[in-house]
UniProtKB/Swiss-Prot annotation:
HAMAP family: Ribosomal_bL20. GO terms for molecular function: rRNA binding; structural constituent of ribosome. It comes from the Bacteria. This is Large ribosomal subunit protein bL20. GO terms for biological process: ribosomal large subunit assembly; translation. CDD domains: Ribosomal_L20. It comes from Chlamydia muridarum (strain MoPn / Nigg). One of its GO terms (cellular component) is ribonucleoprotein complex. Binds directly to 23S ribosomal RNA and is necessary for the in vitro assembly process of the 50S ribosomal subunit. It is not involved in the protein synthesizing functions of that subunit. The lineage of its organism: Bacteria, Pseudomonadati, Chlamydiota, Chlamydiia, Chlamydiales. InterPro entries: Ribosomal_bL20, RIBOSOMAL_L20_CS, Ribosomal_protein_bL20_C. The keyword Ribosomal protein applies. Belongs to the bacterial ribosomal protein bL20 family.
Amino acid sequence: MVRATGSVASRARRKRILKQAKGFWGDRKGHFRQSRSSVMRAMAFNYMHRKDRKGDFRSLWISRLNVASRIHGLSYSRLINGLKQAGINLNRKMLSEMAIHDPQGFALVAAQAKLALEASIQG
């Protein structure tokens, strides 16, 4: 009979997978074979959604900016265009935070964008 070796490493590997499967339901929690496939699937979703989160936040900031800019008589796209023409380099996250926490400051920025747009139309 062949001598079994590597029991410490095998146990550690199985233990690591079962630890990651904590909170899963049914056999997926305690049986190694099912836990392994469930953990791999969960990790794949985790990877995907970490990438998706960036776009989700960008969409949120754009939605907030659209609402805030319409209060000042601009659409979102015209606001961004006006900011570029005015040479104001604030990213969407900072503009969104400004619109929420510093409405007066955002009003000044929107006014600058509006002036830059009007100047480009006239000249």
